[in-house]
Design a protein with these regions (language model features):
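A glycine-rich phosphate-binding loop feature that marks nucleotide/adenosyl-phosphate handling sites
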Residues: 479-483
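A contiguous binding-surface segment within folded domains or other stable secondary-structure elements
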Residues: 435
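Formylglycine-dependent sulfatase
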Residues: 3, 16-432, 440-461, 468, ...
Length: 512
């Protein structure tokens, strides 16, 4: 039987077409399977929660049953650190996977510029339902990177808009009760999500940010039971201040429990990575905005039933900039060159090999001007204060607290010990070095001791190398304070909404 070339060619073409269709179908099924198996993500972010102010991290005096339950079902990170102890710069760093000086949002209230990439937009591009609820604090350019944004009113947590030198000390309160928690839309957003898509939720609380209300908890914390660090005075007013702070943590914990319950109701818990952390330390002097552990250490808890061993603890160093590449890796995506953090997925699997040897943090303008940097390894911390002529004034909300007023009173009476006076010290040491094993509260600066000269030189060199890697630039002028450091009154420099970094440069307020 003769074989015709035309027949052979036509048959081959049909086979190729069939093969192509089959492969396309198979690849489509494979991609569909990958999408179906991609985990969901829920990030719950506290506002001004100290790392050791929940039960799972050692403070059993605070009522946090839901966070304790989350910890018992997931992994606690005992050495997790933020890149900044200031609200918006810390959040920008988490989302961009970059250090504050790389984001152009390193000062408080500076919005994230449109040019910056944030990891939720990669998830949205891949078909995730990406939504945020609660405190926003990211700037207008980031809204379109989310499918839905439900921002709570935070006007009651700052002085009146555009208040300046003539303003009084009154707050413009516009919410009360649970609405002040910043969490009232968390569960609603989870219920109203697109059920046909994997989801990423950024749930940002306002609790336990100041100012505080009385009687917000059905089970108020007794002032006599609060745990005070040695750098705060032990007086009745300070204890009452801490008790109100504990009450707000308890309210936050209640909303965390509601989210966890809703995930169970939706049968989504098993395939959802739940991440809990705080944006900076507690809103007290020498905590929030400081580079001590009380400012930059965060109570990171991650639960993922399919992978993470329940009630496990990780003692390796982790930085907030590592969260973005880790989430992207868990979703099956490469991080890309803009993310400078390191994925720690291996730690979630229980592997103990360290992913980093040190963490780095920045202190920049937050109500008051300052510029300090820190390097921390497992045992030692090095801090360099570039504006050592200025005192380490607490942020304005902490400076208005009963705790700081007590510190001021005791200092005026000559009764405030040296260990509680660092907020008033000017000039400060140019360099600080602490042995965290021997001095966990960082009260004894050993930078000038010859016995620690090698450690000081090593960490100083690490800081200089970090500056080169991040291409950090030294500002040519200082940013004006928005409050008087003695009276706490607003200055003419206070403008709301605060200008972006670029506008401040254009207006000559700062020089980069």
């Amino acid at each position: 039987m003769p074989v015709y070339p035309f027949f052979i060619a036509r048959t081959a073409a049909h086979l190729a077409l069939i093969s192509s269709i089959f492969c396309s179908y198979a690849n489509g099924e494979q991609e569909h399977g990958r999408k179906a198996n991609r985990p969901n993500f829920v990030v719950m972010l506290a506002d001004d929660l100290g790392w050791n102010d929940i039960g799972a991290f050692g403070n059993t005096k605070v009522h946090t049953p839901n966070l304790n339950k989350l910890a018992s079902e997931g992994m606690c990170f005992d050495q997790a650190f933020l890149t900044s102890s200031s609200c918006s710069p810390s959040r920008a760093s988490i989302l961009t996977g970059r250090y504050p000086n790389q984001t152009d949002a390193e000062q408080l209230h500076w919005p994230i510029p449109e040019s910056q990439k944030i990891f939720p937009e990669r998830l949205k591009l891949a078909g995730y339902f990406v939504a945020a609820a609660g405190k926003w604090h990211l700037g207008e350019a980031m809204r379109e990177r989310f499918s839905v944004v439900r921002e709570v009113d935070t006007s009651g947590f700052q002085l009146p808009a555009n208040s300046g030198v003539g303003a009084n000390d009154k707050f413009a309160e516009s919410s009360s009760g649970d609405d002040r928690s910043g969490c009232s839309e968390w569960v609603n957003l989870l219920r109203e999500r697109d059920s046909q898509k994997p989801f990423f939720l950024w749930l940002a609380a306002v609790d336990p940010h100041r100012p505080y209300e009385d009687k917000i908890s059905a089970r108020p914390h007794p002032p006599e039971e609060v745990l005070l660090p040695p750098y705060h005075p032990d007086t009745d007013l300070v204890r009452q201040d801490y008790a109100r702070y504990y009450d707000e943590i308890h309210r936050l914990d209640r909303f965390v429990g509601m989210v966890l319950d809703e995930l169970e109701i939706q049968k989504a818990a098993d395939n959802t990575v739940v991440i809990f952390l705080s944006d900076n330390g507690r809103p007290f002097p020498r905590d929030k905005t400081s580079l001590y552990d009380s400012g930059i250490r965060t109570p990171l808890i991650i639960r993922w039933p399919s992978t993470i061993k329940p009630a496990s603890r990780c003692r390796q160093l982790v930085s907030a900039i590592d969260i973005a590449p880790t989430i992207l890796a868990l979703a099956g995506f490469p991080a890309g060159p803009s993310y400078v953090g390191k994925s720690f997925t291996s730690l979630l699997e229980g592997k103990e090999a360290p992913t980093r040897d040190a963490v780095f943090a920045e202190k920049n303008w937050h109500d008051y001007e300052d510029r300090s940097r820190a390097v921390r390894d497992h045992r030692f911390k090095y801090i360099v204060n570039h504006y050592a002529d200025l005192p380490a004034t607490p942020p304005a909300d902490a400076a208005r607290s009963d705790t700081f007023k007590e510190m001021q009173r005791l200092r005026a009476e000559g009764l405030l010990p040296e260990t509680q006076s660092s907020c008033f010290l000017a000039p400060r040491p140019r360099e600080e070095l602490y042995d965290l094993k021997e001095d966990p509260h960082e009260l004894r600066n050993i930078a000038g001791l010859p016995a620690h000269g090698d450690t000081l030189a090593r960490l100083r060199a690490e800081y200089r190398q970090w500056r080169v890697r991040t291409r950090e630039k030294t500002p040519r002028m200082r940013t004006p304070d928005e409050f008087d450091r003695v009276t706490g009154k607003p200055t003419p420099a206070r403008i709301r909404p605060r200008w972006s970094k670029q506008k401040m440069i254009e207006e000559g307020v700062i020089l980069p």
